[in-house]
Regions:
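Extracytoplasmic/periplasmic substrate-binding proteins
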Residues: 50, 110, 249-331
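Extracytoplasmic "Venus flytrap"/periplasmic binding protein-like
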Residues: 66-134, 169-178, 281, 291, ...
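A structural signal for short loop-to-beta-strand junctions that line the ligand-binding cleft
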Residues: 93, 100-101, 128-167, 312-315, ...
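Hinge/lid segment of periplasmic solute-binding proteins
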Residues: 107-159, 184, 212-213, 243, ...
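Mature extracytoplasmic/periplasmic domains
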Residues: 120, 271-272, 276, 287-291, ...
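Extracytoplasmic/periplasmic solute-binding protein
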Residues: 146-154, 159, 184-236
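Conserved C-terminal helix/tail region of periplasmic/extracytoplasmic solute-binding proteins
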Residues: 169, 256, 382-440
Length: 440
């Protein structure tokens, strides 16, 4: 599976008053962060992360310091592991049971492929508390919080587009399109005004040698309800379904119609091109907000990609990662209490101050672009969707990473691209295509 590099935001956010208070752990004698929760005897546990120097690392360090201040008897030793082989190190440490009590864990199928050494948290933290965290089910067994939550989310992330308001105004576009038909009208106006509508390439994160197609695919597949995405996993809905091909045919028309750059396969400057005003739109995520605001100021806007025949009413809002407890941890009460502490308003404020979007229901941010993104599901009736590359088999993701890009560039037909994805799926054993999600 493609390893997403979680590039955190460089600006500070803030939590508004009135957040829901965290509940006490079901196995403790006090609220999270209180001395009565874990006793007063000296305890040392370790925490591994792969954040480097990102804002996620700042949030983690500040959470640890705040928790230790509440518990002078507790020492949490932070270990920053290399990102490129982080999960290999975790797996090796789990075999010898020499790893950490707490560890950064990615959500979706990343969690499920590692669940053999993760501790379910439902007996330590009340389900009512866990369910206050948006998207907590995506770090749970079978993506069902009732079946056992493994990960307490650290932050929320979005897949979204960015657009240049000044270029839209120059082309005479007064409102952002909401469906395929309106989008095609808009890109035609931009082209007529001599403006490149979209730029595609490696983007802000540089996840692959070409562009990352799953920002787009997530929105194209919103023609199905969230629950029906499981049919893509089981094969009940084939990737070669005519409805999916119809979506891809509309999508690739953006490139074949001349509404993108011509070098979509090898453009390494797409994000910089957008920031410098050379294109009206680009696909990214919330990790790009800070750079976009710095470069374009009030001229930058965020949008929900309107890759739908009907007005789009879904948004990718997903807890990209968080912390889990290993099942071989020798001080589970302390580790669980730290995770419970992460659900409290005080901890969520620390997360926000580091420039991340907290996952607690009712939280918000002072940044206007993030506020707009949060408002779609919170206030406008949009349905929250996961990142599709986190909930379909990694082998299919790997195939799609090349075939979808080739189809967009016009070097492969959409039918062939989807057939290769379907062939990859059907080659997997039945256990990997069952009604129960598994990581491997």
């Amino acid at each position: 599976m493609v390893q997403r590099r979680f590039v955190a935001l460089a600006f500070a956010s803030s939590i508004v008053a009135g957040l829901l208070a965290g509940c006490s752990s079901s196995t403790s004698t006090g609220a999270p962060g209180s001395p009565g929760a874990i006793g007063t005897a000296p305890v040392t546990i370790s925490l591994w992360h792969n954040y480097g120097t990102e804002a996620n690392a700042t949030a983690t360090d500040n959470l640890v310091k705040a928790y230790e201040a509440l518990h002078p008897n507790v020492t949490i030793t932070e270990v920053s592991q290399p990102a490129n082989n982080y999960f290999d190190l975790l797996k090796a440490a789990a075999i010898s049971k020499t790893g950490p009590c707490l560890a950064t864990q990615w959500t979706g199928l990343f969690t499920l492929q590692d669940q053999s050494y993760l501790e379910p948290l439902n007996s330590y933290i009340p389900l009512s508390t866990l369910n206050q965290l948006k998207g907590v089910q995506w770090g749970a067994a079978n993506f069902d919080a009732n079946s056992g939550v493994y990960v307490v989310p650290l932050e929320m992330q979005f897949y979204n587009g960015f657009y240049n308001k000044a270029l839209f105004a120059q082309a005479g576009i007064t409102s952002f399109p909401t469906d395929w038909a309106e989008l095609m009208t808009a890109v035609q106006k931009l082209k007529a005004a001599g403006i490149q509508a979209f730029t595609y390439g490696t983007g802000a994160q540089g996840l692959t040698a070409g562009f990352y197609p799953f920002y787009d695919l997530s929105y194209m597949m919103m023609m199905y309800p969230v629950a029906d995405w499981q049919k893509l996993y089981t094969g009940a809905t084939a990737w070669t379904d005519p409805a999916i091909k119809a979506q891809l045919d509309k999508w690739v028309a953006l490139e074949s119609g001349g509404y993108t750059n011509t070098d979509v396969l090898n453009n390494t400057e797409s994000w910089q091109q957008f920031l410098s005003g050379k294109a009206a739109m680009t696909m990214e995520g919330t990790w790009g907000v800070a750079d976009a605001e710095k470069s374009l100021g009030s001229n930058v806007g965020v949008f929900v990609p309107p890759f739908s025949d009907q007005p789009i009413k879904g948004i990718v809002e997903f807890p990209g990662d968080g912390f889990a407890m290993t099942n071989y941890c020798s001080n589970k009460a302390v580790a669980a209490d730290f995770l419970n502490y992460m659900t409290t308003p005080a901890a969520q404020q620390i997360i926000a101050a580091a420039g991340l979007i907290p996952s607690l229901q009712g939280s918000t941010t002072s940044d206007p672009l993030e506020t707009q993104l949060l408002s779609y599901a919170a206030n406008q009736g949009y349905t929250r969707y996961p990142m599709i590359d986190n909930v379909i088999q990694p082998e299919v993701v790997t195939t799609a990473s090349t075939t979808l890009v080739a189809a967009f560039a016009g070097t492969m037909s959409t039918q062939d691209a989807l057939q290769k994805m379907q062939d990859t799926l059907t080659a997997l054993p039945d256990s990997r295509r069952s009604s129960t999600y598994t990581g491997s």
